[in-house]
């Protein structure tokens, strides 16, 4: 009995340490991957202009690294440089870029700017659920409940099982 108790505790400790080391190694892997992607896009942007997909990907990497200013700059560069913004195949990316800019400004507590970018995303893609939910949240924050409810209704018409719209709609009633 006395011998099995320390073995049991050591086994539990070993399992805990193995799990903990696995989690840390996954985090390190994510950090190194993010850093290599950032460096790749940084080098590529120095050598030539980034296309719309690369610019969007670079902006996402900048957000993940909490380089919000750089993400804003890169997003605006992509939107400004690209003359193919009106093509339908780029509409989804452009809507995501506008939504991403809205998200950055929302996190910086610049709700008016965020609202403008969410509206632009919806202009590009009227059924973009994420931007619709984000704009509705802005209206909630500014106590414009009727507009928020209308946007949540639109989301629920597109996707009836949308958890965000269902939850917020119940909350604002």
UniProtKB/Swiss-Prot annotation:
Keywords: Chloroplast, Plastid, Repeat, TPR repeat. Pfam families: TPR_8. It is found in: Plastid, Chloroplast. SMART domains: TPR. InterPro entries: TPR-like_helical_dom_sf, TPR_rpt. SUPFAM superfamilies: TPR-like (SSF48452). GO terms for cellular component: chloroplast. PROSITE patterns: TPR, TPR_REGION. Its main location: plastid. The keyword Repeat applies. It comes from the Eukaryota. Belongs to the ycf37 family. This is Uncharacterized protein ycf37. It comes from Porphyra purpurea (Red seaweed).
